[in-house]
């Protein structure tokens, strides 16, 4: 993380004011007192800047990527190379600057939905059209999965990713064995252990070929509320959405995004549990309808695909994440939900 003074000195050295003025189409200057660090990790840091223009002061976001690690490279490339395809679904990018083995991206500040309102299931209908729009832009586009983007965009069907899933599932099986002996987890895991461990050992890493058969596109990969932004969440029609934090983006079956957006939130929101079936049915219908509007139809029933995507993602990633969090004393409250749903839907889907 940069101290405010050091960061501002770097702006002066790199002539950032001049470059932003060119991008914004009018004279602009970063206010040295208006620099706030919002978040800093070993991979990146995010700063909010106040930029003075003739027409008034505007907030901007600066994201500093500290290395070219794979996840950073994916997000940097989404912001730099995918703008022509994903325009309108990303924040406006004003400047990309390379500095001392770091990449600095100056972008539009758009407020996260979380914090603008108390989220209610009805609000999904204002977000899902943008998810469908995102997927429709590159749906089954082989120029994306086989073309020049393949050098930086992970492809779910690739041998590299398949090997990664195999490795991850093996780790999940090991954690499940450990969970059966751990006082914190054994009562949660025991009723489902035989079924889930059998699936992990015998059936993976790809449990449902239908997911790939029903279409892939650029997916965000981490559609939680803090990664979904809009300037105005007060309207009663589809919101103008911009997605941020693209480090998990890949060319993958589209239904994974829907299960993260909807089912993971249902798992967290205990107050929604009585209406869970109605909520997911409503969301799946909205998504299928929005994709149909854009000319795309799913051969397999949409609700089946939704459940398949959830089970696949949970077996390859979700269970591992929750078990790891429990063993690291960092939570893991979704473990009972995941174990129960994987068992129930796994049987229902014939696994």
Where are these regions (language model features)?
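Active-site activation/catalytic loop segments of kinase-like enzymes and analogous catalytic loops
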Residues: 77, 248, 255-295, 311-333
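ATP-dependent phospho-/nucleotidyl transfer catalytic cores
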Residues: 113-125, 142-220, 231-232
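Conserved structural core of kinase catalytic domains
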Residues: 95-127
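Juxta-kinase regulatory segment immediately upstream of eukaryotic protein kinase catalytic domains
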Residues: 1-32
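A conserved alpha-helical element in kinase catalytic cores
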Residues: 63-93, 122-127
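Active-site acidic catalytic loop and adjacent metal/ATP-binding pocket
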Residues: 36-52, 56, 200-254
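ATP-binding glycine-rich loop module of kinase domains
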Residues: 47-73
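Conserved beta-strand elements flanking the ATP-binding pocket of the protein kinase catalytic core
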Residues: 50, 91-97
């Amino acid at each position: 993380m940069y101290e405010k003074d050091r960061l501002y000195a770097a702006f002066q050295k790199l002539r950032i004011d001049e470059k932003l003025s060119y991008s914004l189409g009018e004279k602009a200057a970063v206010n040295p007192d208006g620099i706030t660090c919002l978040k800093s990790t070993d991979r990146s840091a995010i700063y909010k800047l106040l930029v003075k223009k003739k027409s008034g002061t505007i907030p901007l976001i600066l994201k500093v990527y500290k290395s070219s690690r794979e996840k950073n490279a994916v997000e940097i490339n989404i912001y730099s190379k995918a703008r022509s395809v994903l325009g309108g679904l990303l924040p406006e990018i004003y400047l990309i600057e390379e500095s001392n083995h770091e990449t600095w991206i100056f972008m539009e500040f758009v407020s996260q939905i979380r914090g603008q309102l108390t989220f209610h299931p009805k609000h999904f209908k204002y977000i899902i059209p943008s998810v469908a729009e995102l997927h429709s832009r590159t749906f089954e586009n082989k120029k994306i999965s086989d073309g020049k983007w393949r050098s930086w965009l992970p492809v779910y069907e690739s041998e590299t990713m398949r090997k990664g899933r195999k490795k991850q599932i093996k780790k999940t099986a090991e954690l499940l064995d450990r969970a059966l002996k751990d006082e914190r987890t054994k009562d949660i895991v025991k009723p489902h252990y035989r079924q889930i461990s059998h699936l992990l050992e015998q059936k993976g890493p790809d449990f449902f070929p239908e997911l790939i058969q029903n279409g892939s596109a650029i997916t965000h990969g981490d559609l939680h509320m803090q990664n979904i932004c809009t300037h105005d969440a007060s309207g009663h029609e589809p919101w103008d959405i911009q997605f941020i934090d693209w480090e998990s983006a890949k060319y993958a079956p589209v239904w994974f995004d829907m299960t993260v957006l909807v089912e993971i939130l249902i798992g967290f929101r205990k107050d929604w549990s009585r209406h869970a079936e109605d909520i997911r049915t409503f969301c799946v219908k909205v998504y299928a309808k929005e994709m149909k509007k854009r000319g795309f139809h799913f051969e397999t029933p949409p609700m089946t695909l939704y459940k398949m995507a959830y089970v696949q993602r949970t077996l390859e990633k979700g269970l591992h994440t929750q078990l790891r969090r429990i063993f690291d004393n960092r939570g893991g409250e979704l473990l009972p939900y995941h174990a129960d749903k994987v068992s129930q839907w796994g049987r229902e889907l014939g696994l």
